[in-house]
């Protein structure tokens, strides 16, 4: 052990100057006999005699019960000798100066220097364990009359001095351990206000060699007038943390809960993240928390984060910016930094300063990468969540964790929804409307720190309905928005800067897509305002609904597009060719096969597999599959022809020369004369719309290469009926006015009238294509009279044959046919009526008027138009009896389908089983134009 003696004169230590090794050395030596000079004044002797008594229990705590007496004796002797040696050096310094009576201010300054020397860490005790802290019974005041002036500082000082005195030192040869310890307190700052966090190594001052510190920490101590503590390097600056120890902070962070660091465990391991930030201490005169020791209460009061009056609108904007901007560099404009998560490899080497966000601190949920937190490097990704209120659903789902909660009596609470914070000091009213509004940060905002910046606003906007958060004193007014767990403040409440707008993760502006209760509906997060449109800042952005509800609107719903696959071979489809979604290969094959009049024969049983690889093996099965899918050469031309259609020029014999249009038909049509022998009439808009929605040609998929059998014909007719039923559903959905009816009424009308619509369409095709000489079911299924006789339903064919013959007799026009077809859909209702009976009657009356308009296109005069109307409506009434025969035959065939080997498709089977018995039993009401 090195022994240093002060035999020569030494200059007194000057505040702020380089430390003197002689003054810092008494703790390393053993006192010599007779070292106290005889010229000591009498006023200082009682003060010296009181020092060892009080410091015996304060600096080196007394052992608890059951401790070794020899160890206690050794500790008492060593502490007493150190104190005496320190005092002798101080007196020797005074005697060397040649003056035995110094002014009082010099004596107090020297005493402060001696006391500061006593506070220095002891070097040689590195291997000696510190005894556990026991109860301090001494009532002696360390700093004399200064302590009563600052009552809250006394317990805090006593709670921190014990671990400072017993911490393990550095190496024996490290000069920074003793040189840095000697420091005179600055003028105007009491010793009780200059505090350091517990450290186990030698602090690094400006005059000592600095080693890399694993966990630098700094504590900013503010006086009531705002002054800050100073050291040799100058005052602490906000946002600029300074290292205070080598392995000190690292050792403090590594102490497990319950372990003794000088007898006091300040921060548990799980809460070691709170030892890193630089916090501002504010005096709080509060009683000790019940059930806790004075030392624990002092420590919690020392390291708690107070709630300060802040600009909460700016806090919300800065929080979003730090949580969402992954490229934020944290330069001079950085408002705060965040502490690393617990159990992080770099948790002991991150300088953290809590500047403008001291309200509440929450631990992170995700560990960052090891190299994500370089010492004094770029800004680290966000690791803390700052918020004033927490959602109850998310808080209860997580495991409880202990946090340090700000307040007069800080304590450890589990991670449950926090109540309102303590009342804040009175502050000036906000200068802008909505400035006091606080936006709660979502609990999942810190999880996705590496995600894109549009994820927050993207997460607020699209999330499931959750429990509403508890309201804080600065929370926005509650809203009853469906599907939103929280609400956003008004746009005016946030700072009107571009950085704040981008930090919030919201688009610059949104255009109103849909409306909910008269308010603009928020659109997709990537949908921004187009150029030229005015910016929209709705006053209430908190009325949100999930995207699922917005897409359920029948007026704005969009069905998912079908997968582009060829319906023939399964290859990637290139488009809709000849009425079917096919690939280019099948398109060319069908065109060549139909135009070349090839007679393909299948080498197998007409059931070959047609796919992308084997589609060229059997052209017969490929062509059959094309016909079954509904491909037709005239499909495209027929579709274009239906879109734009004009009335055919009538012969001069059929129509007289152009004459004046009667008054009664002037509303129905207009006549434009291009030449003396040709008249072109404009079609009413509704009839023109009916032409555009007319279904395309549908194929039955019947194999005409095989001989006809009863079962094959019936099966092909059933397949055709299934496709036509789907076509009727699609057509009715496009029918003007039909969607205004109740959904149950729509289904009922289709189920009651699908057979009438099929037979009526059969008669129209037979009339148009073969002039009513045959039954034109489909382009690939045309029955002449010979094939009718060979079938098992010849009598039924004769019944259906009456319809095209009536069309030929009446010379029905396409406009009349389209209006009559809609009236057939509305000709049968249940006995009890429909749910939307009023809308149904209005719709039916409107289409009756359209039929009159269609009649007026050809008939001149009221008498002829009335006769024509009677003939057409009589035909509609006669269809009821004809369709009843079809219903009876269809139900009988359906019941005997297994015996007859007839296949019925699924949808058609459901309609037959559910509705045909009701219709045949008379449980429906046919709407007739004329009485029987």
UniProtKB/Swiss-Prot annotation:
Gene3D superfamilies in UniProt: Erythroid Transcription Factor GATA-1, subunit A (3.30.50.10), Retinoid X Receptor (1.10.565.10)
Cross-link (Glycyl lysine isopeptide (Lys-Gly) (interchain with G-Cter in ubiquitin)): 387
Biased composition (Acidic residues): 220-231
Residue interval(s) of motif Nuclear localization signal: 183-187
Protein name: Progesterone receptor
Post-translational modification Phosphoserine, affected residues: 20, 81, 130, 162, 190, 213, 293, 344, 675
Gene name as annotated: PGR
MF-aspect GO terms: nuclear steroid receptor activity; sequence-specific DNA binding; steroid binding; zinc ion binding
Short motif (LXXL motif 2): ranges: 115-119
Location of the region described as AF1 in the Swiss-Prot/TrEMBL record: 455-545
Disordered, as annotated region: 1-254, 334-356, 414-451, 468-499
Compositionally biased intervals (Low complexity): 88-103, 232-254, 334-349, 433-451
InterPro entries the record matches: NHR-like_dom_sf, Nucl_hrmn_rcpt_lig-bd, Nuclear_hormone_rcpt_NR3, Nuclear_hrmn_rcpt, Progest_rcpt, Znf_hrmn_rcpt, Znf_NHR/GATA
NR C4-type zinc finger span: 566-586, 602-626
Domain (NR LBD): residue spans on this chain: 678-912
Cross-link (Glycyl lysine isopeptide (Lys-Gly) (interchain with G-Cter in SUMO)): 387, 530
Record organism: Hylobates lar
Subcellular location: Nucleus; Cytoplasm
